[in-house]
Amino acid sequence: MLRDRNRSGVRGGAEGPSQRQRRVAEDLRHRLAELFARTEFRDPELAGVHITVAEVRMSPDLKHATVFVSRLGATDIDRYLPALKRIAPFLRGEIGHGLRMKFVPDLHFQPDHALDEATRINELLHRPEVMRDLLKPDEE
């Protein structure tokens, strides 16, 4: 007998993250942001570096988390990804103390270039030739 695939709890890949995935991702984002703000890491590459956690996406089984990170005012986040990968076990341990889940997710860091792109677009919009076109009255 075939089971009903439309029942709640069974999700296809095209529907997007579940409410549980979103809730766990947001909780994880808050915990990571707090750790990055309050912890001095032993890794010399991360000494004095301020990391911003922009977004966290959870896998459907909640065992993997993709963490999108950036640095405010800097575009060199790619060079810190290996150091973030090295401290991932420490971060998992710290997160595990307060996370009420069966498994603490594996952390996979990715650069978040959205802020860099927004800054670039803002600079383009404030160029003199663009400002001239924006301030020119309509001639129809």
From Swiss-Prot:
SUPFAM superfamilies per the UniProt record, alphabetical: Ribosome-binding factor A, RbfA
In its UniProt record, which GO terms are filed under biological process? maturation of SSU-rRNA
Subcellular localization, as worded in the UniProt entry: Cytoplasm
- Keyword Protein biosynthesis assigned to the entry: answer is no
One of the Pfam families matching this protein, by short name = RBFA
Q: What is its main location?
A: cytoplasm
Quaternary structure, per UniProt, is: Monomer. Binds 30S ribosomal subunits, but not 50S ribosomal subunits or 70S ribosomes.
Q: What is this protein called?
A: Ribosome-binding factor A
Species for this entry: Acidiphilium cryptum (strain JF-5)
